[in-house]
């Protein structure tokens, strides 16, 4: 299974909509930057028909060093999670 990259998306959109690669790159970069900024400022991002990027706070917990087996503290942190929407889930399930 192949991986799609940001460059693949830019090239596809540029060809499909007959836009310059530079203009398309700017649109894609700005779109992703808005998502990054929203998450950075503590806002969840909801993309209708696609899914939600949500922030979750994880509390500190004891972890384990896999090499030595020693218990090490894992500090509290904030993580980004993605929850696919119903439409995306349904389409992905059809492709199995």
UniProtKB/Swiss-Prot annotation:
Keyword DNA-binding (UniProt): yes
GO terms for cellular component: cytosol
Sorted UniProt keywords: DNA recombination, DNA-binding, Transcription, Transcription regulation, Translation regulation
Gene3D superfamilies per the UniProt record, alphabetical: IHF-like DNA-binding proteins
GO biological process, one term: regulation of translation
InterPro entries, per the entry: Hist_DNA-bd, Histone-like_DNA-bd_CS, IHF-like_DNA-bd_dom_sf, IHF_alpha
Keyword DNA-binding: yes
Single GO term (MF): DNA binding
Annotated S-S bridges: none
SMART domains: BHL
Assembly: Heterodimer of an alpha and a beta chain.
UniProt-listed PANTHER family: DNA-BINDING PROTEIN HU, INTEGRATION HOST FACTOR SUBUNIT ALPHA
Protein family membership: Belongs to the bacterial histone-like protein family.
Summary of the function given for this chain in its UniProt record: This protein is one of the two subunits of integration host factor, a specific DNA-binding protein that functions in genetic recombination as well as in transcriptional and translational control.
Protein name: Integration host factor subunit alpha
Organism: Haemophilus influenzae (strain PittGG)
Organism taxonomic ancestry: Bacteria, Pseudomonadati, Pseudomonadota, Gammaproteobacteria, Pasteurellales
